[in-house]
Amino acid sequence: AVPTLVNDYTDGLLDLTVELAGNERRPSEMRLEAGLFDGETKIFAETRDVEVFDSLAVVELTAEVPDVNPWSAESPSLYTLVITLADSRGRVLESVSSRIGFRTSEVKGGRFLLNGKAIYLKGTNMHEHDPVRGHTIDEALMLKDIRLMKMNNINAVRTSHYPQPERFYELCDEYGLYLIDEANIESHGIGYHPDITLANRPEWLGQHMFRTVRMVERDKNHPSVIIWSLGNEAGDGQNFVETYKWIKGRDESRPVQYERAEKSTRTNERHTDIWCPMYPSIERVESYALSEGQPGFDRPYIMCEYAHSMGNSTGNLQDYWDVIEKYGILQGGFIWDWVDQGLLETSEEGEEYFAYGGDYGEVGSPSDGNFCCNGLVGPDRTPHPALTEVKKVYQYVGFNPADLTRGLVTISNKYDFTNLSYFTINWEVLANGILFRSGNLRQISLEPGDSLTVEIPWGDIAPAPDTEYHLNLHVSRSDEWGIVPQDHMYASEQMLLPFHAAAKTAASSVASVAAGASGEESLALIDTRTEGSDLTFAGEGFEVVFDMAAGVMKSYRVAGQELIMSGPRPDFWRAPIDNDYGNGMEKRNAPWREAGGRA
């Protein structure tokens, strides 16, 4: 079934191909009925009389369905398609059903469009992983993943690096997640050189094609699958040109992508519809956008992997999205990755922990250490701090100060298909962190992509001395939104308010000294003296000594007591994090570790 949208994306078009296999030598007269249901209501039905032989019979049906509810991750509207085969006397022989969604997925004018609209893919990569069962996951864990993603504004998953269990696709159809479905093809270890990669060896075409066909034929009816991926890190060559061509001939309703397709040295045949690099720098991302219109820079740019979230990481995510939201050709990316692949173990002391490379086998066994633990959540789906950052950066409601002295704030609706009238915006003013005023803005009607400046009605504020005022904004829904519980907070913002009590008017002590003031209100003059390389500043009850040769403070005494063992020195080093070790930073920047000691 290929359900798409026509007539300015308002009506549905259902192209249905049914294959019938007979088991008798003589033809059998059959009746085929296709019915489409919206809930319990049948909105379309068509019947065909067919003759079925022992060979395959193909029946094609096309129908236009007016005023359908389009499927999207924000509004995953599904219809039930029921196909029934009966004999000539009307007895039902077989009946099958499938839940389908009407939507379009295409690349036009250098943009990836869903239902005719350029959208952002705020995605993550995901491996199958259970901390106890390993690669075997059940429906409860699938639902937990989907719920967590939706609660943290993630709208897309790349099924790295193989198709997921079919039930996962059904749940993504139902609750709304965009999927890049990736063929189970990776030959990273072979190497990428055109002379050795399996992608260029004709004897491996069959295996490339087999895995591609299997994925497409199994998953083709799922509306959540919006893009096909030819594989991952498997080099590039003619085999991928052929699998690309096969998909485009079999399914015209989705784009196809492959990261290595832009790195081929043996073929000039284009075989990716999307420019989908791995781990580009922010400068490289912007460079692509600035090159739009030049040869080769005419496709949407969606990173298939970025923001490697291993350990203490994901810190520059906002910097990426500042650039992404600046240029139309940049349309998001997929964080690496969703879940740490640790396994639950119990220590000799009876404490549970998550084990990874190095915890198994004899000492010295080959291991990638904790390289399998680079997720936004732990193996048990406990969120890491990075997920909080992802939720904030990916949020769909933006706030910017317009004129905070008058309480004016500009609200932007970054949803693709959802009006903000479904949400409540709660606000609160804090005085030194303590609640001072609060209220809410209900039913602000704001269409996707629009902005509106509103007044926050906090009234008159008489600033208190030594008090900081902040405005907090929170966006929530009072109802359940699919799999997300009611009253969940989807977006937030904090702004420092420009309210300050008038400063006390008093002449500064420094000014008094400079003017030669005397008496109790003046400070005692600081004594300065030099002895060798020592420069000393002394005043009432204190003394500070600097070593001018070394350029450091060597002594700080108060009331005759020494307060320091040695003075501060410049430090140009920080503790490396996991991603630093991954790219050799601790070796590359080693001279800076000792630079402070030589300063």
Which residues make up each language-model segment?
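Secreted/periplasmic carbohydrate-active enzymes, especially glycoside hydrolases
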Residues: 1-166, 171, 175-176, 211, ...
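Short, glycine/charged-rich beta-strand-loop motifs at protein surfaces that mediate ligand recognition
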Residues: 376
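Substrate-binding/catalytic cleft of secreted carbohydrate-active enzymes
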Residues: 146-149, 156-373
